[in-house]
Structure formats: structure tokens, C-alpha cells
Amino acid sequence: MTVQTFTPNQTTTLETAKKTIAEQSQNSQTTGNKIGFVSLGCPKNLVDSERILTQLRTEGYEIVNSYHDSDVVIVNTCGFIDSAVQESLDTIGEALKENGKVIVTGCLGAREDEIRQVHPNVLGITGPHAYQNVLEHVHQYAPKPAHNPFTSLVPDHGVKLTPKHYAYLKISEGCNHRCTFCIIPSMRGDLVSRPVGEIIGEAERLKNAGVKELLVISQDTSAYGVDTKHSLGFANGSPVRHNIKALSEELGKMGIWVRLHYVYPYPHVDEIIPLMAEGKVLPYLDIPFQHASPRVLKMMKRPGQAERTLERIKKWREICPELVIRSTFIVGFPGETEEDFQILLDWLKEAQLDRVGCFKYSPVEGAAANEIEDQIPEDVKQDRFERFMLVQQEISAAKLQKRIGSTMQVLIDEVDEEGAIGRTYADAPEIDGLVYLNGETNLKPGELVNVVIEHADEYDLWGSILHDAQ
């Protein structure tokens, strides 16, 4: 969808508990080394889950899909906003009820007392990206197998929870910013960039495994390398600077889709746009602007030059006319006046962004914004949210109408008896729009096909394959 509210994503190795328990045989046997796993929250958390699962699999643990068969269940939590915290606590509770042996990790794990107050019987709790600590807890309650039948079965690119044709590529951990609505730095720490050679190596393994799209993620993607003072690294024996432009250039050599997410609007982002115009990376930029009122941006501790940003967007589009810009915004931030909100709407109409997510401000325990006076009533937040959505829906619908009659390359995500569903370069998985190909049942996920766009609504496209141009 183009306009959205926040709902924590859930990726799990487990089937729905009630269905699974009902179907289990009373004679099921456990061997002491079977692990169930639930991953909540953002793609960055998903990558952490993949790393943990890869290590567990390498050590010989079996990953299973039912609470009943699991010797231990790991829940990788999200703690970004209150709804995410509640989702995490509910999931921990479900795992305790259905299995009883639960290890908790992730962002909410940084607030152990809060978890223990609700669920005192969890076996162990660790914070985010504490991979080794998670493994130590697993070793304590589900000892490593003496015989490892899976060593040769773990793929070079590790265990992935995404479909085979796309993968998230995390380039750094933590964040140096101190936005007043966010507590991520207190949970994940300051920016730590991965070595460029390590990133390129992982990307190559993913490509060799059949991945057609890399989604580059971090807390602050455009800050990549700041902590190393943009030192010189090496990838495949060649020198490469630790900065987002150089990294993007290297990734762009692989001949697959490269999509940049969570890009903070630093001045040097301007240097990436020519790479998009040249086709080295997808002309898609995910920049969380958050607001447009200078007063609100100052309270958020975000960049406050909204007019300057409009000028940059205009320049970007001149350099790369196909550029798609996705962003997220917060309405109902403490102290936001009707005048501030109107500035946001006017800016949105001027910016004509392609994909937009909207969140009603939600207090986060420990966030500095909670101390700001003039907290906004819930009914006012809802009203502003709906008005914001209407404006962006009109913008999105008009933009997609212009796609009708054009031919676009589409990456197929899924196929069923009704047809295929895919995405264009303008659409990231899970958060953006889709392309529906009715009746096209002979395609496979991961295929790239040329599609003539025939219909559009506010968010999605419909079309037919251009068979003689594939």
C-alpha cells in the first residue's frame, strides 16, 4: 500500500498455534535440538533473525514449524512503538502458553524488566543483534547436537526468511541521530558500519543463490562509513571507500535490482541520483522526511529545510526522470498545530511523492517527545491522518494513471490459480504497490517479464505480458 499505518511484521517458522497443536500426534518425539522461531518488526530485525537461524542451522539444530515440536522457541521482538511492544508481549505469551520454553531477543529485549514484569518465566532475554548471547541461551536449554547432519546443507548465503528471489542486505547497525520520537539508538547503539568487502561478499553469494533484488537497509543507510571516517576498504581485491556512493557503485555492477532504503537526506545523497539515472541502482529512494513544518521538524530534531528539500527533489527528477520517492510522515506529533499540519499538506502537494506511509504519533517509553507539552488528542490525530491519506491517495492515483499504456519490467513475487502478482522498480516488497497479471499462471516467482499496464487504482496496477518483447 502507498499510505499505511504501522503494523509489526511477523515472520515465523511456526504454524498457527491452535491449528498446529490440534494436528499434532500425541506420539511426537523431541530430540532436544529443535528450534521454533518468530521474528517481529522491521526488515533490520529480520536480518538479525536470519543470522541467528543460520548459526543454529550450522551447529546442527533443526528449525521446526510447530510449538509442540520445538524444544525451545526464540522470539525476536520489536519495541519501536507501543503497538509493537504489545505485539511482542502477546507473541511471547502465546509461545509460553503453547510451548513453555521461550528465549527473547531483539529491541524489546533491551528492556528486560518490562518483559519480566509480564512474563517472568522466559528462559533468557537479550538485546538486539546479540547473536552470541542468544546462542549461549540456546546451548543452555537445548544442547548442541553431538552429530550435525546439516553442516553440508546450510547454503553459502545462510538461512533466509524472505522468498528466494529477494533479500535484505544490512550494511550497518545503530544510529548517530537522536530523533525525539525514537529510542532505537538506546537499544541498538551508535552507528557501526560493516566492512565493505564483507557486504559485497554477501551480496555476491545472494546473487549466486538466485536473488534478483537486494534491498539495502540499515538504521541510516546514507551514513554508511561515517564511523570509519570513510576509510578505504577492499572488495574482490580492489580498493573501495566506506561510503554509500562507492558501495552503491559496487552493488550496481552485479546486474540485479539494488534498492536503497532508510536514506537520511544528507547533502551527499545528491551524488547517488546519477547512479540511478545510469541504471546502476534502481531509481527508487526511500527517505523518511517525517514532516514539513520547520517548527515540528525542530522538535523532532530532524533536518528542517523543507523548501530546500523541495528544490533538491526537483533537481533529482531533472537528473533522473524515472525516480520514485518513498517517504514516511508522522501526524499528531506533540505540539503540532493545525497550521503545522497545513504546512505538511501543502508540502505534500508540492512534492508529489510516489509512495508514502503515514503514522499517527504514538508515545514510546523513553522517547524525549513524551516530555513535549501539548500532546495531541487521539481524535485530532485520527482526523489529520485521514486528511493526509486523502491528499496522498489523490497524488498516487494520478501518478499511477500515467503508467497506463506504458511497458514496465515486473519481478514476479507469487503465482496461483488466478494469475501472477509482481512489482515494478517503483515498488518495494510488503510496503508498496503490486502489479496483477490475471490469468498468467505459467510464470514463476523471481521471473522478470515486460508488462503493458492496462489499469490502475490508488495503489496498484494491472496489466498483460508483452510476450514478443521478453
Curated annotation (Swiss-Prot):
<keyword id="KW-0808">Transferase</keyword>
<dbReference type="InterPro" id="IPR020612">
    <property type="entry name" value="Methylthiotransferase_CS"/>
</dbReference>
<dbReference type="Pfam" id="PF00919">
    <property type="entry name" value="UPF0004"/>
</dbReference>
<dbReference type="InterPro" id="IPR007197">
    <property type="entry name" value="rSAM"/>
</dbReference>
<feature type="binding site">
    <location>
        <position position="179"/>
    </location>
    <ligand>
        <name>[4Fe-4S] cluster 2</name>
    </ligand>
</feature>
<keyword id="KW-0408">Iron</keyword>
<feature type="binding site">
    <location>
        <position position="42"/>
    </location>
    <ligand>
        <name>[4Fe-4S] cluster 1</name>
    </ligand>
</feature>
<dbReference type="GO" id="GO:0046872">
    <property type="term" value="F:metal ion binding"/>
</dbReference>
<dbReference type="InterPro" id="IPR013848">
    <property type="entry name" value="Methylthiotransferase_N"/>
</dbReference>
<dbReference type="Pfam" id="PF04055">
    <property type="entry name" value="Radical_SAM"/>
</dbReference>
<keyword id="KW-0004">4Fe-4S</keyword>
<keyword id="KW-0411">Iron-sulfur</keyword>
<dbReference type="InterPro" id="IPR005840">
    <property type="entry name" value="Ribosomal_uS12_MeSTrfase_RimO"/>
</dbReference>
<comment type="similarity">
    <text>Belongs to the methylthiotransferase family. RimO subfamily.</text>
</comment>
<keyword id="KW-0479">Metal-binding</keyword>
<dbReference type="InterPro" id="IPR038135">
    <property type="entry name" value="Methylthiotransferase_N_sf"/>
</dbReference>
<dbReference type="GO" id="GO:0035599">
    <property type="term" value="F:aspartic acid methylthiotransferase activity"/>
</dbReference>
<feature type="domain" description="Radical SAM core">
    <location>
        <begin position="161"/>
        <end position="398"/>
    </location>
</feature>
<dbReference type="GO" id="GO:0006400">
    <property type="term" value="P:tRNA modification"/>
</dbReference>
<feature type="binding site">
    <location>
        <position position="78"/>
    </location>
    <ligand>
        <name>[4Fe-4S] cluster 1</name>
    </ligand>
</feature>
<dbReference type="InterPro" id="IPR006638">
    <property type="entry name" value="Elp3/MiaA/NifB-like_rSAM"/>
</dbReference>
<dbReference type="InterPro" id="IPR002792">
    <property type="entry name" value="TRAM_dom"/>
</dbReference>
<protein>
    <recommendedName>
        <fullName>Ribosomal protein uS12 methylthiotransferase RimO</fullName>
        <ecNumber>2.8.4.4</ecNumber>
    </recommendedName>
</protein>
<feature type="domain" description="MTTase N-terminal">
    <location>
        <begin position="33"/>
        <end position="143"/>
    </location>
</feature>
<keyword id="KW-0963">Cytoplasm</keyword>
<feature type="binding site">
    <location>
        <position position="175"/>
    </location>
    <ligand>
        <name>[4Fe-4S] cluster 2</name>
    </ligand>
</feature>
<dbReference type="InterPro" id="IPR005839">
    <property type="entry name" value="Methylthiotransferase"/>
</dbReference>
<dbReference type="Pfam" id="PF18693">
    <property type="entry name" value="TRAM_2"/>
</dbReference>
<feature type="domain" description="TRAM">
    <location>
        <begin position="401"/>
        <end position="467"/>
    </location>
</feature>
<dbReference type="GO" id="GO:0005829">
    <property type="term" value="C:cytosol"/>
</dbReference>
<dbReference type="InterPro" id="IPR012340">
    <property type="entry name" value="NA-bd_OB-fold"/>
</dbReference>
<feature type="binding site">
    <location>
        <position position="107"/>
    </location>
    <ligand>
        <name>[4Fe-4S] cluster 1</name>
    </ligand>
</feature>
<dbReference type="GO" id="GO:0051539">
    <property type="term" value="F:4 iron, 4 sulfur cluster binding"/>
</dbReference>
<keyword id="KW-0949">S-adenosyl-L-methionine</keyword>
<comment type="function">
    <text>Catalyzes the methylthiolation of an aspartic acid residue of ribosomal protein uS12.</text>
</comment>
<feature type="binding site">
    <location>
        <position position="182"/>
    </location>
    <ligand>
        <name>[4Fe-4S] cluster 2</name>
    </ligand>
</feature>
<dbReference type="GO" id="GO:0103039">
    <property type="term" value="F:protein methylthiotransferase activity"/>
</dbReference>
<dbReference type="InterPro" id="IPR023404">
    <property type="entry name" value="rSAM_horseshoe"/>
</dbReference>
